[in-house]
Amino acid sequence: MPLVVFCGLPYSGKSRRAEELRVALAAEGRAVYVVDDAAVLGAEDPAVYGDSAREKALRGALRASVERRLSRHDVVILDSLNYIKGFRYELYCLARAARTPLCLVYCVRPGGPIAGPQVAGANENPGRNVSVSWRPRAEEDGRAQAAGSSVLRELHTADSVVNGSAQADVPKELEREESGAAESPALVTPDSEKSAKHGSGAFYSPELLEALTLRFEAPDSRNRWDRPLFTLVGLEEPLPLAGIRSALFENRAPPPHQSTQSQPLASGSFLHQLDQVTSQVLAGLMEAQKSAVPGDLLTLPGTTEHLRFTRPLTMAELSRLRRQFISYTKMHPNNENLPQLANMFLQYLSQSLH
């Protein structure tokens, strides 16, 4: 059955959404398999995305795991970053080869894919929504007071600009607040990040998050491998179960590509007769052109049609055309065409030589 690919940066709620979808589909009696980084690595390790060789091996393991599970009867959910469009195209090719539909669920953190933790009270005033560093409080150590002062100064500057008056100096009330900034929490982590950290237990360093953001290739519904596309911003937005069900169980599977299909096998007798008939036609043509003049109609063995003679032909040229005809005919074998092989080859020669 279908393939569901989750895509998004860390802390965007992918795992929670994947579990929500798994529970909803399992409640309908469907067999659902979830493939994620932890299932492949044994435990989620964010450091993999900092090493190109290990990340490439991880993508190969994820693709192999999906390919093993993918069938017309089970639903496979891939819960990973999947931020490279080339990898998403490979997954699309797997679904197309298995003749099963797929859809893409793109999870985005509120405030944009690179927004960091927000300042306390930022939701109450849009002008105070100031993004700060991804660096956790535990790594700040003695710099907590300086960080709090910087945040408060940015807050005051943002409020001043919103109110239409930019002030150069910090008021005394703000200075008194800065002195106690280290004692009161200055940063509040969004609910989506809390749930993501609680669910996975993995920590992505600020440098790694920045690198992933720069490498991230956002899905585009104009690409056939990125549609149908469902975009979810935050955890408050409900999961579009009706649309996902329609995409997975009502849509037709992507049409198979001709290069991925097995060509029909030709029987041994067909190939033997094809080789014999074309050889006889060439031998008859070489013999007939010895006494022919341009404009004559040549009658060749095994044919009911005629070939107009226009110029002398070499054996090398005729052999090349014979190989081309045999290669094409082997790809489309049909035992019903056996009596017409000589006429078909004669028509091919006539079109190729004139």
UniProtKB/Swiss-Prot annotation:
User: Where do the segments described as Disordered lie?
Assistant: 116-149, 162-199
Q: Which residues carry this modification: Phosphoserine?
A: 184, 200
Q: Spell out the InterPro entries in the cross-references.
A: KTI12/PSTK, P-loop_NTPase
GO terms, biological process: tRNA wobble uridine modification
Instruction: Give the intrachain disulfide bonds.
Output: none
**Any matching Pfam family:** KTI12
Q: Where is the composition biased (Basic and acidic residues)?
A: 170-179
Extract the GO molecular function terms from the UniProt entry. ATP binding
Instruction: Tell me which domain of life the UniProt entry assigns to the organism this sequence originates from.
Output: Eukaryota
Residues binding ATP are 8-15
**Gene3D superfamilies in UniProt:** P-loop containing nucleotide triphosphate hydrolases (3.40.50.300)
Q: SUPFAM superfamilies, per this entry?
A: P-loop containing nucleoside triphosphate hydrolases
Keywords assigned by UniProt? Answer: ATP-binding, Nucleotide-binding, Phosphoprotein
Family according to the record: Belongs to the KTI12 family.
Q: What is this protein called?
A: Protein KTI12 homolog
Natural source organism: Homo sapiens (Human)
Q: What is the lineage of its organism?
A: Eukaryota, Metazoa, Chordata, Craniata, Vertebrata
